[in-house]
Design a protein with these regions (language model features):
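Conserved class I S-adenosyl-L-methionine
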Residues: 1-45
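Class I SAM-dependent methyltransferase SAM/SAH-binding core
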Residues: 49-92
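SAM-dependent methyltransferase
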Residues: 138-161
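A short glycine-rich, Lys/Arg-flanked "PGG" loop and its adjoining helix->strand segment in the class I
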Residues: 119-131
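A short His-aromatic
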Residues: 110-112
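A short acidic, Gly/Pro-enriched loop at the edge of an enzyme's catalytic core
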Residues: 94-101
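A conserved beta-strand element that flanks and buttresses the S-adenosyl-L-methionine
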Residues: 103-105
């Protein structure tokens, strides 16, 4: 299920304000060299398109494509018209051997919960990749149990969960 904050244009417009600038994100520092070395890139769950916009601003001259099911987020992404933005999910597209690199940043992969969802997503990603293509993603490590620190952090900010 897509959260309302990602579909509502007014809320999606605020999303990037709550994130570090793309040039200061550790995950983007990891992903950007991968994007820059790939001819054609698909960002699954691209959100507002910050990573693809950074790649284009950094000189990527090839094909950049963002896929996201949240229309509000894509409306923000579409501020950059030299990148293809697709409204949908992996089940709604049928790319065949079109991308050198597929990425899923910001823990987007953890949206797949059930085994059949994971298998279907991986099959769609594999189909979208050219021979020798790469898939890069990250997800939270449940063994770290980061959520246990959240109440303390939120309380220190004078807020509540």
């Amino acid at each position: 299920m897509i959260e309302r904050k990602f579909t509502d244009d007014r809320l999606a417009a605020l999303y990037d304000a709550f994130c570090p600038p793309p040039t200061r994100r550790d995950d983007f520092a990891f992903y950007l060299p991968l994007l820059m070395s790939a001819r054609a890139v698909l960002d699954v769950g691209c959100g507002t398109g910050a990573l693809l916009r950074l790649a284009r601003e950094s000189g990527h001259a090839g094909r950049l494509c963002g896929l996201d099911p949240a229309g509000g987020m894509l409306n923000q992404a579409r501020r950059r018209s030299d990148i293809a933005w697709v409204h949908g999910d992996l089940a709604s597209v049928g790319w065949e051997r079109e991308f050198d690199l597929v990425v899923m940043t910001g823990h987007a992969f953890q949206e797949f919960v059930a085994d059949d969802e994971i298998r279907a997503a991986l099959a769609a990603i594999r189909a979208a990749l050219v021979g020798g293509g790469r898939f890069a993603f990250e997800t939270r490590n449940p063994l770290v149990r980061a959520w246990e620190r959240w109440p303390r952090i939120v309380a220190a900010l004078g807020a509540r969960l």
